[in-house]
């Protein structure tokens, strides 16, 4: 965990990375699990933790898996620093407020849940009999899964990602041709936006598996990287092309999209409103892209130049119609680059027309 976030709440992805296979902490936890001694680990030592800690002895030594294993043989809880790099206390008794509700039945897990809610710190409970590692923080509870199980789920998700990526590629290929023909409708835009989001959601799910797998997730990471390189960037440029009012940071809108429920994502009216249009917009009405996405596909054309071209012409249609002289007048574009843009757009148009015919 981030050393600077003393006692701060971490999101689940950060926590999973913190205890992932390959980390010293996970090695120590696995040793305790195999020894079947059980254990309770508190990560962080803020004022709220001090209120619930009683007894034990001060260690204040560097963390090592071997030290954790030996100290876990005692009944009390182990207190680590926020970064997990130091063992601060061992054999402590945790005494959270008994009035804090808990859904757990075992004493160790009930204590862990209450301490997590009272302090906001990450609490790791290692089961003595069930061979289970449970993470608690505030109201969050997460049971770490077996590595083999996670790998199976990750591989299934990769297969799903491949299928959705094919569907997205087909939709984008069709959109490319429609953009050159000036035949894009709001229905096409919403359809592609939905497909982008579905692919990104599956990617985010796989990323959670990768974080939980730690060093075991290297091959999964490579597969995802190969499948959807620069996908967020392309989705962001697509948003910049079709959002009603120009925006500086399309990733804010993409984040709003990711925060939507599956039900909201299927509602065309909600997606139209997200892009700044009326919910009653006719889906068959034509809409014209600004040209960010296609211009970005031209090799060695920097994003600031793309921005200047769009700013100068407004829409892709006018950029395509512009001659070399018109392009040459745009800031940052000389005669050579103007020729490159004209040829690049022509090649893209021919390629996308051919792809569509196939």
Curated annotation (Swiss-Prot):
Residues 9-147 form the DAC domain. ATP binds at residues 76, 94, 107-111. InterPro entries: DisA, DisA_sf, DNA_integrity_DisA_N_sf, DNA_integrity_scan_DisA_link, DNA_integrity_scan_DisA_N, DNA_integrity_scanning_protein, RuvA_2-like. It is an enzyme of class 2 (transferase). GO terms for biological process: DNA repair. It comes from the Bacteria. Its EC number is 2.7.7.85. Its cofactor is Mg(2+). Keywords: ATP-binding, DNA damage, DNA repair, DNA-binding, Magnesium, Nucleotide-binding, Nucleotidyltransferase, Transferase. HAMAP family: DisA. Belongs to the DisA family. Participates in a DNA-damage check-point that is active prior to asymmetric division when DNA is damaged. DisA forms globular foci that rapidly scan along the chromosomes during sporulation, searching for lesions. When a lesion is present, DisA pauses at the lesion site. This triggers a cellular response that culminates in a temporary block in sporulation initiation. Also has diadenylate cyclase activity, catalyzing the condensation of 2 ATP molecules into cyclic di-AMP (c-di-AMP). c-di-AMP acts as a signaling molecule that couples DNA integrity with progression of sporulation. The rise in c-di-AMP level generated by DisA while scanning the chromosome, operates as a positive signal that advances sporulation; upon encountering a lesion, the DisA focus arrests at the damaged site and halts c-di-AMP synthesis. This is DNA integrity scanning protein DisA. The lineage of its organism: Bacteria, Bacillati, Bacillota, Bacilli, Bacillales.
């Amino acid at each position: 965990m981030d050393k600077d976030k003393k006692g701060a709440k971490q999101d689940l992805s950060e926590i999973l990375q913190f205890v992932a296979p390959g980390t010293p902490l996970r090695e120590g936890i696995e040793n305790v699990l195999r020894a079947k001694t059980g254990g309770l680990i508190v990560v962080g030592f803020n004022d709220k933790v001090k209120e619930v800690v009683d007894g034990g002895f001060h260690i204040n030594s560097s963390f090592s898996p071997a030290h954790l294993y030996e100290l876990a043989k005692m009944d009390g809880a182990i207190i680590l620093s926020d970064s997990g790099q130091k063992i601060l206390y061992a054999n402590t008794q945790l005494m959270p407020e008994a009035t804090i509700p808990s859904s757990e039945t075992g004493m160790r897990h009930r204590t862990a849940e209450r301490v997590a809610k009272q302090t906001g710190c990450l609490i790791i409970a290692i089961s003595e009999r069930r061979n289970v590692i449970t993470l608690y923080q505030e109201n969050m509870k997460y049971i770490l899964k077996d590595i083999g199980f996670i790998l199976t789920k990750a591989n299934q998700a990769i297969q799903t990602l491949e299928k959705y990526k094919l569907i997205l590629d087909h939709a984008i290929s069709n959109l490319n041709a429609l953009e050159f023909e000036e035949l894009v409708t709001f229905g096409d835009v919403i359809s592609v936006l939905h497909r982008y989001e579905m692919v990104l959601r599956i990617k985010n799910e796989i990323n959670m598996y990768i974080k939980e797998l730690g060093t075991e997730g290297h091959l999964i990471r490579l597969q995802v990287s190969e499948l959807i390189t620069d996908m967020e960037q392309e989705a962001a440029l697509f948003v910049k092309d079709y959002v009603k009012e120009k925006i500086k940071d399309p990733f804010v809108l993409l984040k709003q999209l990711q925060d939507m429920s599956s039900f909201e994502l299927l509602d065309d009216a909600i997606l139209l409103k997200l892009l700044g249009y009326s919910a009653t917009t006719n889906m068959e009405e034509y809409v014209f892209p600004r040209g960010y996405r296609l211009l970005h596909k031209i090799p060695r054309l920097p994003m600031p130049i793309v921005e200047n071209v769009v700013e100068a012409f407004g829409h892709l249609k006018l950029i395509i119609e512009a001659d070399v002289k018109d392009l040459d007048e745009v800031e940052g574009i000389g005669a050579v680059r103007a020729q490159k843009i004209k040829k690049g757009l022509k090649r893209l148009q021919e390629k996308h027309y051919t792809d569509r015919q196939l």
